[in-house]
Regions:
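Structural motif corresponding to the early beta-alpha repeats
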Residues: 23, 35, 39-127, 234, ...
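Active-site-proximal loop/turn and secondary-structure-junction residues that shape catalytic pockets
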Residues: 12-14, 41-43, 69-72, 107-110, ...
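Catalytic-core regions built around general acid/base machinery
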Residues: 48-60, 128-136, 193-196, 223-228
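Short beta-strands and strand-loop turn motifs
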Residues: 7-10, 37-38, 66-67, 102-105, ...
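Histidine-acidic metal/acid-base catalytic patches
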Residues: 1-10, 14-30, 57, 97-99, ...
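Active-site acidic/histidine proton-transfer and metal-coordination neighborhood
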Residues: 19, 58, 78-175, 185, ...
């Protein structure tokens, strides 16, 4: 994937990617000298792709898009709807000039059946990702599968599970997307997920244990960075902290209280902390 260096999830400034949100978020990302941004495609058809592309080009900023599937298009039970939803999102990603569509592209945030995943669910997901990868290839887009914690989804919780799905599909334009917040819950150790996914890992969310300011929780940052350095990671390092969320997103992520004072606290303290660690371990 062509995205490298340090980026930030634009939830730091907005979860509504309209023209105003795009202008504010991109201006802020430029201010903090980010290499790329991650844009949440909560409503892909409504995004003014030409406007976003012009802003990205103007500021020479790269972008990745991300999403979780709505219940009406959960891949495990509604594969045809998921294929169509991802087709629209992939097209919008390409039109915006972004290089990848990642996140919970296999299911929904909050999708749980109450029982372990079934072979039928995984077969449906593989079918969806196969179709999506073929369409993404025609648009020059890569796809990322993000392993998320058991409370948000029951299907892919660890780096190894993400690898298993990617190898099941067998498409070379799908990569593993890890997240330190989820890893801190699901992996035996932070390094385990990174080592398990090393052949496919191209993108990682750097998110604190409470989703707040990095460096002020209990994520084992030295272990994380040491493992990334050990595998020669050269993908995207994306800081993710949820400050501005609409109620439906807060519900899906189970965030019920402020996790940081404001964006200045996260960008002023958390970002330098993460960048300094990355420099310490030779990642940037």
């Amino acid at each position: 994937m062509s995205v490298q260096g340090f980026g930030v999830h634009t939830s730091m400034w907005t979860m509504n990617w309209d023209r105003d949100g795009a202008e504010r978020a991109i201006a802020a990302a430029v201010k903090y000298k980010m290499d790329f941004i991650e844009i949440a495609l909560l409503n892909a058809p409504a995004v003014d792709a030409a406007h976003t592309r012009a802003l990205l080009d103007k500021h020479e900023l790269s972008a990745v898009c991300s999403l979780g599937l709505p219940e009406s298009a959960w891949a495990s039970v509604r594969p045809d709807a998921a294929i169509e939803h991802l087709r629209v999102a992939i097209d919008k990603t390409a039109e915006m000039g972004a290089v990848a569509l990642s996140g919970v592209i296999f299911g929904g945030i909050g999708e749980r059946t109450g029982v372990p995943p079934t072979e039928g669910e995984y077969e449906n997901i593989a079918r969806v990702l196969t179709a999506a990868s073929k369409h993404a290839r025609t648009r020059g887009i890569e796809l990322g599968v993000e392993a998320v914690n058991r409370y948000e989804n029951h299907l892919i919780n660890t780096g190894w599970q993400a690898v298993q799905m990617i190898e099941r599909v067998g498409a070379d334009n799908i990569f593993v997307h890890l997240d330190t917040y989820h890893m801190n819950i699901e992996e035996k150790g932070a390094a385990n997920g990174i080592l398990d996914a090393r052949e496919h890992l191209k993108y990682i969310h750097l998110s604190e244990s409470d989703r707040g300011t990095p460096g002020y929780g209990n994520c084992p940052w030295d272990e994380i960075y040491a493992a990334l350095a050990a595998i020669g990671f050269r993908g995207g390092l994306a800081m993710e902290s949820f400050i501005n969320m609409p109620p439906e997103v807060a519900y899906g992520l189970a965030v019920w209280r402020p996790v940081a004072k404001d964006e200045e606290e996260v960008m002023g303290n958390g970002l330098p902390f993460l960048r300094n660690k990355a420099k310490q371990y030779g990642l940037i």
